[in-house]
């Protein structure tokens, strides 16, 4: 895991109420384009990285982006190694038993992607006998195991979504399930465009898929939560959110 921290300078002068120490904002160390991934120089780039900078500036906080392995990101938060999570983490009842969340900052559908020309629907019947690849320790693992576990040949787990995508291209799995934006990015690549297509959105289950994506926070950190909520609200209200989103997405991903 990279130990180099990418510092996002919120150049506004900190007010007296601002936090004295930089806020360590955890992102997943595994690449998750277009939200966060390292460029050729090893710098973390992407929509979520840009949003962290904008939200922290709007809230007059100095923030440090800190890559953490996805499967250890909540323990890193609760143990104090990081102060917040902005890593496309869905707000679910299960997670809220352990941590708190800010207001949502995006909400997009969950979809199934499979090979072109293969009849497939995004439900248990359509995925019967199929090998479905999902990223481990995600809402997609929980959903696939709950809804497709009895009918699918296998729910195959991957450390990263990129690995699942590569196996789909190679024909080692029959389908993958993930956030629509992440899979749109895959389908925009040469390999993805050649092999695969969206088969449809899965039926929503907010208990598993959550109520949008928010900033993960330790319970009891009410002041920090208020700062993130204020920063999110400000970048949405002043148009910064849409300005940041425009290079990445054809339409708003804020959702309902």
Give names to the regions the model predicted.
Residues 21-89, 97, 238, 247, ...:
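Extracytoplasmic small-molecule ligand-binding "clamshell" domains
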Residues 54-58, 66-67, 71-83, 98-100, ...:
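Short helices/loops that flank or line small-molecule/ion binding pockets
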Residues 29-30, 107-114, 191-229, 249-256:
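Periplasmic-binding protein-like
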Residues 49-59, 118, 126, 130-131, ...:
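Extended ligand-binding regions for polar small-molecule ligands
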Residues 72-75, 89-97, 143-147, 174-209:
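A ligand-binding cleft/hinge motif common to bilobed small-molecule-binding domains
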């Amino acid at each position: 895991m990279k130990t180099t921290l990418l510092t996002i300078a919120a150049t506004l002068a900190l007010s007296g109420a601002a936090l004295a120490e930089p806020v360590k904002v955890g992102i997943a160390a595994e690449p998750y384009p277009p939200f966060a991934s390292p460029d050729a120089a090893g710098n973390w780039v992407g929509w979520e990285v840009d949003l962290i900078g904008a939200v922290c500036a709007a809230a007059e906080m100095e923030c440090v982006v800190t890559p953490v392995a996805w499967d250890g990101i909540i323990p890193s938060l609760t143990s104090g190694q990081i102060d917040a999570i902005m890593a496309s983490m869905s707000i679910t009842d299960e997670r809220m038993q352990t941590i708190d969340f800010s207001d949502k900052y995006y909400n997009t559908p969950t979809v199934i992607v499979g090979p072109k020309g293969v009849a497939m629907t995004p439900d248990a019947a359509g995925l019967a006998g199929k090998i479905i690849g999902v990223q481990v320790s995600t809402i997609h693992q929980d959903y696939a195991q709950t809804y497709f576990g009895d009918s699918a040949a296998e729910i195959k787990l991957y450390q990263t979504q990129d690995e699942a995508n590569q196996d789909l291209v190679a024909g080692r799995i029959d389908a993958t399930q993930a956030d629509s934006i992440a899979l749109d990015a895959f389908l925009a690549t040469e390999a993805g465009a050649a092999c695969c297509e969206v088969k449809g959105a899965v039926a929503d289950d907010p208990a598993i898929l959550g109520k949008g994506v928010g900033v993960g926070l330790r319970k009891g950190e009410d002041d920090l939560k208020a700062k993130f909520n204020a920063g999110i609200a400000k970048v949405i209200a002043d148009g910064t959110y849409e300005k940041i989103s425009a290079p990445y997405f054809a339409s708003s991903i804020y959702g309902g």
